[in-house]
């Protein structure tokens, strides 16, 4: 079903069964196959391919030669029914690839709202990207990676499968990330190591000085106290009871399975 207000270039191919919403623009030589739904005001510039059981939300800009919902590269995948879901107001630049999920994972590759994926970014099967993230040119996420809100991934960086990157993390360019990265941390290198708190990012997002001071103290407890994470976690949990910003640490450590970068 194609909404009457949608604008579709004559060279675009739209398979029967696709749902194209109000004021959607689909440019030259785009291909939309399968049970795809594209919601209101989303723009496919040109040469964009969208396949499979894919939902793209409202007000997205998707640039040329991007591929969304394609069969993933997991050798165990045998064509099972899995999904790709993209939220609202994302910018997805040229040559980005976003693959559908697997039944061995959560079955869904999901991207939230207000994210920027720059040129040549790869998002593998079952990745979960939340909101307001920036992935710079040639950043690569392996399968099952999770990015929490406001993560910045520098250009040419690679993140190992199943890694969790906490909220407000900044990863420097060319990083190889093979373990989980706690919230608010700056990290860089091969393999990535922590080198402080992302204070500039927190200032830009309106964090006050007492909150940033509390976050720095938690960072010091984790990385400079000489104690193990198991030893400092009870104290962090106690602080988190009265400080919502610190609760991000507690929630993160409950999810973390790969150990944290050191």
Swiss-Prot record:
Family matches, as SUPFAM superfamilies: Trimeric LpxA-like enzymes
Record flagged with keyword RNA-binding: no
Signal peptide (residue range): none
KW Signal (keyword) present: no
EC id: 2.3.1.129
Biological processes per GO annotation: lipid A biosynthetic process
Cellular-component GO terms for this entry: cytoplasm; membrane
MF annotations from Gene Ontology: acyl-[acyl-carrier-protein]-UDP-N-acetylglucosamine O-acyltransferase activity
Origin: domain of life: Bacteria
Role of this protein: Involved in the biosynthesis of lipid A, a phosphorylated glycolipid that anchors the lipopolysaccharide to the outer membrane of the cell.
Subunit relationships: Homotrimer.
PANTHER family named in the record: ACYL-[ACYL-CARRIER-PROTEIN]--UDP-N-ACETYLGLUCOSAMINE O-ACYLTRANSFERASE (PTHR43480), ACYL-[ACYL-CARRIER-PROTEIN]--UDP-N-ACETYLGLUCOSAMINE O-ACYLTRANSFERASE, MITOCHONDRIAL-RELATED (PTHR43480:SF1)
Name this polypeptide is given: Acyl-[acyl-carrier-protein]--UDP-N-acetylglucosamine O-acyltransferase
Species: Haemophilus influenzae (strain PittEE)
The gene coding this protein: lpxA
């Amino acid at each position: 079903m194609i909404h009457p207000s949608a604008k579709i270039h004559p060279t675009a191919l739209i398979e029967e069964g696709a749902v194209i919403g109000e004021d959607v623009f689909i440019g030259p030589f785009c291909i939309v196959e399968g049970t795809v739904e594209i919601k209101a005001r989303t723009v496919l510039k040109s040469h964009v391919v969208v396949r499979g059981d894919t939902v793209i939300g409202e007000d997205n800009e998707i640039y040329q030669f991007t591929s969304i919902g394609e069969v993933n590269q997991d050798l165990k995948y045998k064509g099972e029914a899995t999904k790709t879901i993209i939220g609202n107001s994302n910018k997805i630049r040229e040559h980005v690839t976003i693959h559908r999920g697997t039944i061995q994972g959560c079955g869904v590759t999901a991207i939230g709202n207000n994210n920027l994926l720059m040129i040549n970014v790869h998002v593998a099967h079952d990745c979960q990207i939340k909101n307001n993230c920036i992935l710079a040119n040639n950043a690569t996420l392996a399968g099952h990676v999770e990015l929490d809100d406001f993560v910045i991934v520098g250009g040419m960086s690679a993140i190992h499968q199943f890694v969790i990157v906490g909220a407000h993390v900044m990863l420097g360019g060319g990083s190889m990330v093979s373990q989980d990265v706690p919230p608010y941390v700056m990290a860089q290198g091969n393999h990535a190591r922590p080198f402080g708190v992302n204070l500039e990012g927190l200032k830009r997002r309106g964090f006050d000085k007492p909150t940033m001071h509390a976050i720095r103290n938690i960072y010091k407890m984790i990385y400079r106290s000489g104690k193990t994470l198991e030893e400092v976690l009870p104290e962090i949990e106690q602080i988190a009871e009265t400080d919502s910003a610190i609760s991000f640490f507690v929630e993160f450590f409950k999810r973390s399975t790969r150990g944290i970068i050191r």
